[in-house]
Amino acid sequence: MAEQFQEQGGVATMDPSPLMRWLSSRVVKRICGDASVSKRRAKAESQRVSSGQAHVVEYFHYVEDGYSHLASQVLQAFSERYDIDLVCHLVRGPQGDNSAEPELLLRLSGYDSFHVAADYGLNFPQHEHAPDQRLVKLASTILAAQDSSQFIECAAHVGDALWSGDEARLQALAESLGCASDTELEKRLDSGTARRSELKHYSGAMFYYGREWYWGVDRLYHLEKRLAELGADRQAGEPLLMPRPKVEPGELKDNGSLTLEVYPSLRSPYTAIC
């Protein structure tokens, strides 16, 4: 069966030696351990304070990505709740080796977002297909014309019109908010994508703060807790904006009638955790 898969080589090899497995495990455990994380965070905070810089959170928005639309709905509340400068970037989709079946990924992002939105108190129109590219272009030109503060205010409205397929509403938003030219749009996308690459990531719906990445609304509670620990929570003691949903196993038990299919990626650290 191994011949069906392409050997990636390097750290992504699918058949490391026992010694390499052991070494990799030790290295990853050391890098990701609580002590190492705390040390890195303390260093980042010390550098921030010494430079006199505010708490700067960068957000990377991929217009036709469902997860980005969910994230856009919390930008306003997030920027108001925490004492931060929220800088918003427009980006292109994953490229190169990071772009595995991009059309399927986009379609599944809409499917996933529709099914999880309610659990976070958010909205996502049911959408069986990727949004129309004409509307994606229009939505992109609207957002490219906004600075970060304007982006925070309007991104969710633009996204809702896009994912609802409401061209008339998008046109109205374009008239009221303005649109970037094609040249300006490309420049904005190039700039945001380059910044994301500089910070060593490839995806949309990403938040970056203090040398760490936080993906979408379902990981935002990690960033909220970190900011609160640094005294940046303007409503200390209040519930988080995006707390981790409780897992309710329910009373039903397996009776042997259901089959769970798992599709692991042997390159993925998530597979190792599972």
Task: Identify the meaning behind each predicted range.
Residues G66, G93-P94, D132, E212-Y214, ...:
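Short, solvent-exposed loop/turn segments at secondary-structure junctions
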Residues L19:
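Short linear clamp-binding motif
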Residues Q47-A77, V91-R92, D254-C274:
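Local sequence-structure signature of Cys/Sec-based thiol-disulfide redox active-site neighborhoods
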Residues K43, Y59, V87:
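Nucleic-acid-interacting cores, centered on viral/eukaryotic replication and modification enzymes
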Residues E3-T13, L23-I31, V37, H69-F78, ...:
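C-terminal cap of thioredoxin/glutaredoxin-like
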Residues Y62-V63, A100-E101, C179-A180, S265:
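Short, contiguous strand/loop micro-motifs
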Residues G33-G52:
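Short alpha-helical hairpin
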Residues V63, H69-L162, C274:
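Structural alpha/beta surface segment adjacent to cysteine/selenocysteine redox centers
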